[in-house]
Each structure stands twice: as C-alpha cells, then as structure tokens.
C-alpha cells in the first residue's frame, strides 16, 4: 500500500497561498502537516479584487465561513454585474454608452431563449437594450441599490468586491488557528532528487523544508514550476494584446456618490480600466498593451480619468498572458499566478485559484503520484483557462470600436481558437452556444457541472448583444408561434414589474454595506427572495 501524503509545503503567501492553505487544511481534515513559507520582502499584487458568485458556495461554505463573517473583515462589497463603458464607440460626453453583463441565465419561453423574442421585437423597432428587456436587475444597478432587502433577504444573484490583502490576512489567521505552520523566510534554492521530483527547499535563514507535495503560489515568478522544474509557460499574447497595468486605490465620497453594486470596465485608447467599488474607496487599474502606448502615457491617462495628482501612489504591473503547459508536474502543483494569468476583464483570477484547489482535492495523490491523476488534473486546468481565454477574447474582436490602433488590432489581428469561431457562427445563426439546461436550479447543483460549462448562453448573449453584434435574423420558428410570442410579451411585462419592485424596495448599496460594517444588517443568512432570477451563477 502506497504511503499517504503527510507533509505539504506551500511557497508564497498572498491570496493564492492562503486560500490553498485554508482549503487543504479543511479538505484533508488536518491529517497532513501543512507549512506555508512567505517572504516579507516580496510584495503582494492586488488593488481591489472582483469575484464571481460561486466563491461563497465553493470556497467559503466549504470552510464553514458565512458571508456575514468574512465580508466586514475584508472591506467586502457586492457585485451584481459588470458594467462595460465605451466599449462600442469612442468616448463622447454627450452620450451614455454602456451595457451590463449580468449573472444568471436567459429566461426561456416555450423552449426558446427570451433573447430571440427580444430580437424579433427589435427588428420591428423596439429600442430597449437586451439586458434591460430580458433581466429585471439593470434598473436597480443604475440606482446603485443593494442586491438584498434591508433584512438580508437576497433579491439578486451577486458576487463580491474586496481588498485581496485583507482576504489573505483573514485566511492566514483562520488557517494558522487550524494548524498551518507559517514560516516567514525566503526560498533561495530548490533541490531535486534523481527522479526530478522536489526533495526540499533551502531558505535564506538556513532552513531546510522537506515535503511530499509542494504547492507553487510564488506568483508569476513560477519559482518551483517554471524555474526549478523548467515547465514551459505557453505565451498567449497573440490571443490577448494587453500585457501591463497601472493601478491604485482611489478615495470615494460614499455619502455623495454612493457605492456602485457592480464592477466597471471602462474602455480606453489602448486597453481598459477596472473600477471595483468598496466602502470609502475603489480599486482601479488601467490594463493596457505596451505595444500601443507607453507606460508614461498610460499612467497619465489613468490619472486623468480619475482626476488624480501626479504624486498618487501607483502599482506598476507587467504580466505574462497564458498558462503553464502543465500546472502539475511530478510532486509540484502550481496555483494562481504561478499557473496561469488572464487579464481580469471577467474577474476570473480568484476563480482560477479555488477551481484549481477543488480539482486538486478531487485528484489528490499519494506518494506514488499516479500520473493518471496529474494528467486528468492538467486537462481540467487547460479546459478552464482556454475556455475563459476565449470568452475574454470575444469582448475584443466583436467590438465595433476602430478609433485607435489598439482597437483596430483587436478587431483584425487576434489569433482565434476554433472553439470561439464556432460559437460566433452558432450565435449569428440563432443556435445555442452551450448545451446546458435553461433551468438554473438544475444547472448549478454541482460545481463539477458548472466547471465544465462555465460560460452560458446568457453570458455570451450579454456580451455579443451588448457590443452590438446580433444574430443575422430572429429565429424563423417564431413566425409559426403566435401563442409563444404572446407568452413572451407577458414575460417581458413580468420582468418590467419585477424591475420596478426591485427599484422601489431595495436599500442603497451604500446604506446596506454601512449597516453590515456596523453590525446592523441581517446580511445573507442563506435567505433568498422568491423572485431571485438566478442561483449563485454566472
């Protein structure tokens, strides 16, 4: 009988490292010795973080930590959508150019997505944007309202914004209390045995750290996976052009301006800027391509966008786009930035961490390190990353913006996968892009199924229709279904009524978050309102 894994060393703290330590100490029921080594000298990347809705279910619920416990400690706020600004046309102060990417799938009527009925109406002169017609949430988002009633009853599916450093610190305390050994030191050498497996690590202060399994959370350095084990990193800069960012925390007058319950993505001349609102401030960063603008010009554009002074503290980031050929090599598993990186346009960074941890536990080895387990794990990570890469890329090559060289290059010069080409053609023909049921309650029963079918028809519809790319024609079948069309009209009317109910019953996001911070809100005791349009989903 092969020996079980008894000792695990995690290299790197930050969000990835402490999420890994917390998840593994819980998953292995404290039956393995877990040591995390982090250096006080190596800075952690992160200026505000946006997430997706499955974070609570897959990660925090697994740890047994309710939303109301962790949110106040990490300056947590709600995210009910992503708002895309100026992605269709160059900025014009006289014009409001935005669309929302909402959570939840598109409703259907007699087996046909409501978007097809909306398109038919649009062909007849209907002007309301798709997401405003097919979802009840946008009006509440425009009003900066919370996704919950004052008593904590949830009315809209949501994800979260938070300070990633505070999350790492929160999880550090949680993990150490449960037996994780924290070492503040720096790895200076990685020793391999004659099989090419990592045997131990040498540290700056003279320690020798031995383990059966090593988790590389060292960030883009890839200290173990790339530097020591020489696993190649597959560069995908021909799929996505942005390679740099300038970021900062920006003060916000919440009482005057409110706190937006969504992430904003504001298109710029050579990239886009994120805005992640929290109480008292928002995290923001300009993601740009160094091939189309200089760092100095990008910094100037970023400061001008928010009216900031030249002495504003800034975080300059250079990133690699792509993934390791294999995320798991021998007895080393890379998690987080050491495994892969995709620009945060759809808030996938934290998801990549806990999805990889979920898959690691599902494929957890013993000391024989059966290659069938690592091969299966690696295939899952390739699927996860490439699928998300295609979805993010779809935001760029389907836009109609052509006012700068950057946007022209995105429309004409990107390398496209066969999978995304096929999705575009299916969308233009009016066909479904994914095979999932339109019933969210069955779709989201297990994370395994969500992982395999991450981006739904509704996600693609929001982006494609939002950017102005529509199917070639409304579904021909609807010409033969007058009764279905009548039913769809009733559904549109019901959505309008629900939108009005949300608009008139929800507190402002600022008031709700302030009550949560002060301990007054009945926040999220697992309650869901009867009108909730979608489960914890994308």
Curated annotation (Swiss-Prot):
Annotated knockout phenotype: Cells lacking this gene lose the ability to produce pyrrolnitrin.
Annotated pathway: Antibiotic biosynthesis
Similarity comment: Belongs to the flavin-dependent halogenase family. Bacterial tryptophan halogenase subfamily.
GO MF: monooxygenase activity; nucleotide binding
Keywords: Antibiotic biosynthesis, FAD, Flavoprotein, Nucleotide-binding, Oxidoreductase
BP GO annotations: antibiotic biosynthetic process
Entry function: Involved in the biosynthesis of the antifungal antibiotic pyrrolnitrin. Catalyzes the chlorination of tryptophan (Trp) at C7 position to yield 7-chloro-L-tryptophan (7-CLT).
Residue positions of the active site: 79
Additional record remark: The reaction between FADH(2), Cl(-) and O(2) produces hypochlorous acid (HOCl), a powerful oxidant. Unlike the mechanism proposed for the tryptophan 7-halogenase RebH (AC Q8KHZ8), which suggests the formation of a chloramine intermediate with a conserved lysine, HOCl is proposed to be a direct halogenation reagent, with the conserved lysine that may hydrogen bond to HOCl to enhance the electrophilicity of the chlorine species and for its correct positioning for incorporation into the 7-position.
Site keyed Important for activity: positions: 346
Documented effect of changing residue 346 to D: Loss of halogenase activity
Binding site for chloride: 348-349
Protein name per the record: Tryptophan 7-halogenase PrnA
InterPro entries linked: FAD/NAD-bd_sf, Flavin-dep_Halogenase_NPB, Flavin_halogenase, Trp_halogen
Effect caused by changing residue 274 to F: No change in halogenase activity
Gene expressing this chain: prnA
Pfam name, any one: Trp_halogenase
Superkingdom: Bacteria
Site (Role in guiding and activating HOCl) residue list: 79
Outcome reported for the amino acid change (mutating residue 274 to A): No change in halogenase activity
Organism taxonomic ancestry: Bacteria, Pseudomonadati, Pseudomonadota, Gammaproteobacteria, Pseudomonadales
Subunit comment: Homodimer.
């Amino acid at each position: 009988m092969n020996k079980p894994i008894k000792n695990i060393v995690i290299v790197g703290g930050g969000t990835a490292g402490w999420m890994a330590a917390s998840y593994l100490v819980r998953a292995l029921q404290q039956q393995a010795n877990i040591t995390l080594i982090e250096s006080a000298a190596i800075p952690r990347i992160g200026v505000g973080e946006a997430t997706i809705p499955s974070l609570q279910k897959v990660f925090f619920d697994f740890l047994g930590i309710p939303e109301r416990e962790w949110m106040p400690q990490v300056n947590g706020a709600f995210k009910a959508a992503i708002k895309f600004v100026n992605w269709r046309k160059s900025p014009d102060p006289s014009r409001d150019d935005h669309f929302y990417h909402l959570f939840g799938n598109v409703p259907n009527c007699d087996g046909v997505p409501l978007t097809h009925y909306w398109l038919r109406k649009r062909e007849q002169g209907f002007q309301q944007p798709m997401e405003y017609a097919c979802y009840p949430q946008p009006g509440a988002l425009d009003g900066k309202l919370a996704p919950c009633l004052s008593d904590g009853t949830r009315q809209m599916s949501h994800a979260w914004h938070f300070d990633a450093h505070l999350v790492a610190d929160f999880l550090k305390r949680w993990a150490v209390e449960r037996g994780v050994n924290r070492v503040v030191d720096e790895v200076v050498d990685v020793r391999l045995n004659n099989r090419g497996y990592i045997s131990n690590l040498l540290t700056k202060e003279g320690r020798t750290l031995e383990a059966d399994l090593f988790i590389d959370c060292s960030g883009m350095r890839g200290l173990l996976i790339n530097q020591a084990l020489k696993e190649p990193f597959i560069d995908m800069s021909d799929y996505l052009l942005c390679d740099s960012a300038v970021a900062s925390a920006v003060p916000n007058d919440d009482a005057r301006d409110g706190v937006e319950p969504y992430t904003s993505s504001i298109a710029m001349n050579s990239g886009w800027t994120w805005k992640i609102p929290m109480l008292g401030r928002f995290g923001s960063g300009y993601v740009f391509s160094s091939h189309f603008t200089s760092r100095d010009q990008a910094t100037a554009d970023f400061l001008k966008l928010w009216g900031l002074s030249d002495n504003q503290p800034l975080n300059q980031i250079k990133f690699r786009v792509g993934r390791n050929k294999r995320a798991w090599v021998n007895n080393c598993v890379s998690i987080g930035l050491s495994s892969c990186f995709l620009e945060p346009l759809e808030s996938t960074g934290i998801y990549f961490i806990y999805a990889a941890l979920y898959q690691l536990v599902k494929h957890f080895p013993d000391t024989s390190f059966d290659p069938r387990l690592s091969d299966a794990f690696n295939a899952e990570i390739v699927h996860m990353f490439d699928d998300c890469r295609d979805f993010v890329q779809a935001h760029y090559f389907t836009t109609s913006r052509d006012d700068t060289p950057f946007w022209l290059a995105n429309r004409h010069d990107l390398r496209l996968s066969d999978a995304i080409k096929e999705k575009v053609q299916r969308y233009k023909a009016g066909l479904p892009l994914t095979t999932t049921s339109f019933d969210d309650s069955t779709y989201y029963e297990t994370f395994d199924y969500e992982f395999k079918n991450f981006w739904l028809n509704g996600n693609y519809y929001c982006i494609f229709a939002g950017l102005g790319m529509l199917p070639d024609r409304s579904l021909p079948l609807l010409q033969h279904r007058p009764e279905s069309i009548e039913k769809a009209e009733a559904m549109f009317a019901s959505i309008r009524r629900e939108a009005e109910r949300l608009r008139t019953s929800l507190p402002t996001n600022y008031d709700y978050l302030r009550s949560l911070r002060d301990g007054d809100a009945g926040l999220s005791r697992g309650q869901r309102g009867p009108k909730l349009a979608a489960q914890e989903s994308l």
